[in-house]
Amino acid sequence: MTAAPGPALTPDTVVANGVRLHYRHGGSGPPVVLLHGWPQTGHCWRHVAGPLAADHTVIVPDLRGYGASDKPTGGMDKRTMAADVSALVRGLGHDRVAVVGHDRGGRVAHRWALDRPEEVTRFAVLDIAPTRATWQRMDAALGAKYWHWLFHLQPDLPERLAGADVEGYLRYFLEKWTYAREGLEPAAIAEYVRAFSQPGALRCGFDDYRAHPVDAEHDEADFSAGRRVTQPLLALWGAEGVMGQTLPMLDLWREYADDVRGRAIERCAHFVPEERPEEVLDELRTFLAEA
């Protein structure tokens, strides 16, 4: 299940785009940035980051509002979050990077590639479809499975209810969205619970979803203007997950990007980097080597 370890990554913090970001970095070679989703932190890349650092410079931030990074009261739209990570990597001396995003991190990667195409050489998205396309297909069947998108949009109430039992709320998703349960070991779940038990962490996580009106405005403007992703794009998803069983993933990405490849990963649901890290590594190494 766990890939062979590579170089250890070093934790650090930096102020980027006005917020303090925690990140880990290590290795040498072409730079690649790994972006996590909800309800997680950069810890979700623990099985992938080290081995990938054997031949890449790997940068793993906690996105604004998550993990050990600042918990601001605004700026959870994907344009701002992408600008944060852009400032981080430029501060580290990298003008052009490959990006890999899981879940919400994939949405940040998509926005980064559109807003700053000169910085993103290629990117991979794990277990997400384009945001605009997903909302367009939010019928009763998909809404019943992705109800949290609608619930997390509500002001204040998600924090009040989830805050009464942070561990119970997170475990619901971490367990229900997982096929290969051994990939999310108890220590990892405990780390995510700890991270979201910090002051402001639940609010920021829900604000990530509540930024949808702003994100939708940006997405619609790009689509209407015919602005597409021109970089090579790799899409991977869990064959047992909601996305893979509900939506035509590659077809949807081809509506938004010119150069798309990818596949479903068997015996895997949503948490792809943890459930099937060796397959993710194989796919990423092949994809990144094409640069």
Describe the role of every protein-language-model region.
Residues 2-12, 19-21, 31, 59, ...:
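Flexible "cap/lid" subdomain of the alpha/beta-hydrolase fold that forms the substrate-access gate
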Residues 36-39, 196, 275:
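Conserved residues at beta->alpha junctions
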Residues 42-46, 203, 282:
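Alpha-helical elements of the RecA-like P-loop NTPase motor core of helicases
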Residues 39, 54, 117-118, 258, ...:
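Proline-centered flexible-loop/turn and helix-kink motifs
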Residues 24-68:
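Conserved HGGG/HGGXW glycine-rich cap/lid loop of the alpha/beta-hydrolase fold
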Residues 15-17, 36:
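Short strand-coil-strand connectors
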